[in-house]
Regions:
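Structural alpha/beta core scaffold segments of enzyme domains
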Residues: 1-188
Length: 188
C-alpha cells in the first residue's frame, strides 16, 4: 500500500442485458471517507480496448453482460468502498438477452452491440475451394461442439497506481499483454 492510498471498487450489473434508467450515487457520496463516485454518464470518451476502443469503461446507457461495471467509488479504506457500493441505487429496464452464439447471429436476434452482434468479418480466399471439394475422395459435413472453456487468468483483477503530484503516475499491475495496457493508458 501507499501512504494516503484510496481504494476504488466497481459496482457490477446483475443483468445480462438492460437499459440503465437511472443511477443514484447520492447516499454513497454522503458517507464520510468516500471521496468520489463515478458513472458511465460522467466518463468522457467512455471507451477502451486493445484493438478497437469499443468497450465502455463503465456501461451506459446499455448493460451488455452480467458483470458490466456501472458505477465506481473511491474511499479511504477498502471496506468503506465496499459499503459505499451497497448504497448506490441503479434502476434497470431489462432487455432480451442472447445466450446462444448461433441465435445471436440471426437477423431477428436482439442486437447487443448496435446494428450487429458480429464483432468483425473478413473473407479469406486461397486456392480453389470448389475444385478441392469436388476432387476430394471424402467430404464430411458435420457440426462439432465442445465444452465451454472458462477464462481463468492467473493475474488478479487489480491495479495499483501512485501519483507523485508532479504529473507522474506509476501504475502496477499484472497482465499478460502489457504493451496493450500501456497503449490504453497512454490514450487516456
Amino acid at each position: 500500500t501507499f501512504p494516503h492510498m484510496l481504494h476504488a471498487k466497481i459496482l457490477h450489473s446483475d443483468h445480462a442485458h438492460a437499459r440503465i434508467v437511472s443511477i443514484d450515487t447520492s447516499e454513497a457520496e454522503k458517507m464520510p471517507g468516500v471521496l468520489a463516485t463515478l458513472t458511465g454518464a460522467e466518463v468522457p470518451e467512455n471507451s477502451f480496448g486493445p484493438t478497437f476502443q469499443d468497450q465502455p469503461i463503465l456501461a451506459y446507457p446499455i448493460v451488455r453482460h452480467r458483470g458490466d461495471g456501472v458505477a465506481a467509488v473511491a474511499a479511504v479504506t477498502e471496506q468503506l468502498a465496499t459499503e459505499a457500493l451497497e448504497k448506490i441505487k441503479v434502476v434497470y429496464e431489462p432487455l432480451t438477452p442472447v445466450f446462444d452464439p448461433l441465435e445471436a447471429i440471426e437477423d431477428d436476434s436482439p442486437k447487443i452491440h448496435g446494428e450487429s452482434n458480429i464483432y468483425t468479418s473478413k473473407i479469406i480466399k486461397k486456392g480453389d475451394v470448389e475444385k478441392a471439394l469436388k476432387d476430394s475422395p471424402h467430404v464430411f459435413h458435420r457440426q462439432y461442439r465442445t465444452q465451454m472453456v472458462e477464462h481463468v487468468p492467473l493475474e488478479p483483477q487489480a491495479t495499483i497506481a501512485s501519483w507523485d503530484g508532479n504529473g507522474r503516475v506509476t501504475i502496477g499491475l499484472v497482465w499478460v499483454v502489457l504493451h496493450l495496457v500501456e497503449k490504453i493508458y497512454l490514450v487516456h
